Structures are given as structure tokens and as C-alpha cells.
């Protein structure tokens, strides 16, 4: 075998006329996956639950094999598609009649912010980092957590955000990128400060240094009172 043989790397022993069959097989599997997505009624991956993603991965694995392996017939992948479609319908019906099964397969929504305060332990137990969570909030126009009455991490990974009215906005943790905020271990002036980890708000005097009473973090940033601009 010759190393870096471009013809071997590109085609190996595959005849040129098989490439047309690969195109046909690819179109066939694309149509199957597309029909399944249409059947689920989802418009994008972010709308899918964990169970639905698992179904798609299983179908994709079968579809990938039939697309370019000449010894894999096309009818079995149709059987896989029909089986998965029936399984999907059955599981959806069962979940509609069993909340426990729905919680097992889909998971539960998690309240991450309540009354402007971050439930950092719940966030740490989720599959989302603080950086990702704060980025999602910023994309929804959130500048500081005191603007948020309730934020829920949904089972599909998206975040539902409910805001305080302007006259009810609280002092909160500023969630702008770190180069846009100042952090202190010794605070420079008397004011309300927010823990950068858990968003706990306490009043501190100039020159004061203390650990957060909620999470024992030593770093603070000045609490923001900014209201939403709509």
C-alpha cells in the first residue's frame, strides 16, 4: 500500500458508477429522516427532547450505513424507520397518560432564578454552565438578575424568562462579561454588593472583606439597579 495515495484515499476500490448509487441512497435516507421530523412536528433540534434526540441518533446511524455501504440493503432501514416511528407514537401516548414516565424520559423543568436570585446549586447540577446561562439571559436583554422574576431551564435546554415590572426591579448581580465588570475581595465603598457565584446581595462598608454567607465565595461586584430598556 502506498501512503498518501490520493486515488486510494478518495475512492479505494469503489467503482465510479457506484457513486450514483450513493447519491440515490443518500436521497432515500434523507427523505426518511425528513419524514420522521415532520411527523414529530418539531421545527428545529432545540425543540427536541432527550428522547427524541435519541430516536434521531438511532435513525441517523441506520441511515448512514445504508447511504454508502454497498452491502447494506435499503429495505431494512425502512423497517427501522417504521419501528422507530411506532415506538415514538407509543411512548408519546404513554407519556400523555403517565407523568412519572414523562419525567423519566423528558426530565423536569428547573427553576434557575427566582425573585432575582440565582439557584446556583441547581444550575451546577444541570448541563449548563454559568457562562452559557448568562449568555442566554443577555440575548434576552437581561443586564442584571434583579430584573428577572423567574427563569426556568426547560427540558429541551431552552430558557423561559419572566420579568419584573420596572417599579419592582431589585438590585442584582450584573451578568455582563467579566471584562465589563469589576470584582472585589475588599470593597472600595459602602454599597450593596452581589456575590459573583450565587448572586447573594448584602450591604458592605468601605474596606470590608468577607465570604458570602450563602456559598462562601470571597469575590463581589457592585449590585446593579439597572432596569430593562424595552
Curated annotation (Swiss-Prot):
Under the heading Gene3D superfamilies, the entry gives: bsu07140 like domains (3.30.240.20)
**Spans traversing the lipid bilayer:** 16-36, 48-68, 75-95
Q: Where in the cell is it found?
A: Cell membrane
Q: Under the cellular component aspect of Gene Ontology, which terms does the record hold? A: plasma membrane
Q: Which keywords does UniProt give here? A: Cell membrane, Membrane, Transmembrane, Transmembrane helix
Q: How does it sit in the membrane?
A: Multi-pass membrane protein
Looking up InterPro entries in the UniProt record yields:
DUF421, UPF0702_alpha/beta_dom_sf
Output the superkingdom of the source species.
Bacteria
Quick one: where is this thing mainly located?
membrane
What family is it from? Belongs to the UPF0702 family.
Please identify the protein, giving its name as recorded: UPF0702 transmembrane protein YcaP
Amino acid at each position: 500500500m502506498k501512503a498518501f495515495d490520493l486515488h486510494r484515499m478518495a475512492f479505494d476500490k469503489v467503482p465510479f458508477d457506484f457513486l450514483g448509487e450513493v447519491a440515490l441512497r443518500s436521497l432515500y435516507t434523507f427523505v426518511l429522516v425528513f419524514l420522521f421530523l415532520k411527523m414529530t412536528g418539531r421545527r428545529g433540534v432545540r425543540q427536541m427532547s432527550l428522547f427524541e434526540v435519541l430516536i434521531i441518533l438511532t435513525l441517523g446511524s441506520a441511515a448512514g450505513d445504508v447511504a454508502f455501504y454497498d452491502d447494506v440493503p435499503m429495505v431494512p432501514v425502512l423497517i427501522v424507520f417504521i419501528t422507530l416511528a411506532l415506538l415514538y407514537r407509543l411512548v408519546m401516548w404513554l407519556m400523555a397518560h403517565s407523568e412519572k414516565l414523562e419525567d423519566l424520559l423528558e426530565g423536569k423543568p428547573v427553576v434557575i432564578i427566582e425573585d432575582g436570585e440565582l439557584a446556583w446549586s441547581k444550575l451546577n447540577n444541570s448541563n449548563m454552565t454559568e457562562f452559557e446561562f448568562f449568555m442566554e439571559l443577555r440575548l434576552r436583554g437581561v443586564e442584571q438578575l434583579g430584573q428577572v422574576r423567574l427563569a426556568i431551564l426547560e427540558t429541551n435546554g431552552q430558557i423561559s424568562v419572566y420579568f419584573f415590572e420596572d417599579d419592582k426591579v431589585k438590585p442584582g448581580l450584573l451578568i455582563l462579561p467579566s471584562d465589563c465588570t469589576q470584582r472585589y475581595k475588599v470593597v472600595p465603598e459602602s454599597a450593596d454588593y452581589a456575590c459573583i457565584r450565587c448572586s447573594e446581595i448584602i450591604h458592605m462598608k468601605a474596606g470590608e472583606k468577607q465570604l458570602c454567607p450563602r456559598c462562601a465565595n470571597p469575590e463581589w461586584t457592585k449590585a446593579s439597579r439597572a432596569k430593562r430598556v424595552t
